[in-house]
Amino acid sequence: MKIGFLLCSPEINGGTNVILEHGAGLQAYDHEVSIITERVVDPMEYAWHPKGDQLEWCTFAEAQEEQFDCLFATWWESPYLLHRFDAKQYIYFVQSIESRFFEEDDPTNMDLRDHSIGALRCDHSYFFSLPMITEATWIKQYLEKNCNQQPYLVRNGICKELYSGNSVLSEKPRQGLRVLIEGPVDVFHKNVPGTIALCREAGVKEIWLLTSSSVEGVEGVDRVFSKVPLEQTPPIYRSCHLLVKLSAVEGMFGPPLEMFHCGGTAIVYDVTGHDEYIEHEINGLVVEQDDEAQVVEYLKMLSANPDYLENLCKAAIRTADQWPDWHQSS
């Protein structure tokens, strides 16, 4: 089949990673796959992903000259664009309920004053009469309950071979915690600055930051890894005891699972999607949203109790071993 994925952005982010992995997976099954973007994309923009150069990239204008057997909308604006393209079947791949990504209206701020309009238009996209596929149980249930949809659930895989090594950038300190924080520093619902502050309050020995933001240094962070290619991330994960990921909104977030595959554990908020693989006090620690005092308490407890930390990590490895790879998912 000839399959196309409409893509919002080729930049480093979890959603784009999922789309490129599925595209490469379908191509491995001998389908012809195109990644379709509004503008011409420089290959350097997707060089962060090891499979980016295996796929055909084309613009909206070029794709409008083609006929597809199957065309995927992949973010909230793209269902409104499908009429521009010729396809036998259109599908909406829903990775989150994206209206939750919009900040509240602020009439005094030109950038924020009309966010509710975009959020409403986003919500309307989930009522389109399209077959839907999603990656998380909570999204499937939301679409069933609120939008009268019957989506298929296809959980994200993970690139097992990428995380199969044992190299590190630096051996973990024997005393105290080295914590990894992941996410863009300027996206409000990722809560990276707040996470850094809580780790500092807890007296964490070292804080590392893995970010898609173009930054050389961040206040309160000991070591910053900015725009790192995907294949270079495992040694970063393996060098840290745990990931602290305190997002306010997620679809089915990948970084804790990646940390599990690298021998670590995670502290997360009870954000949507966490329960796909994180079990409280078994393979990680789950904190009620915005309970900052509990986050600090858990960090202090793990620092003082390495045996408990080790037990969480061992269970996280067992969870990782049971998780499907991208070949199975695609």
Predicted segments, located by residue:
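Conserved catalytic-core segment of nucleotide-activated headgroup transferases in glycan assembly
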Residues: 142-146, 158-162, 172-217
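Conserved acidic donor-binding segment of nucleotide-sugar-dependent glycosyltransferases
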Residues: 280-281, 285-291, 301-306
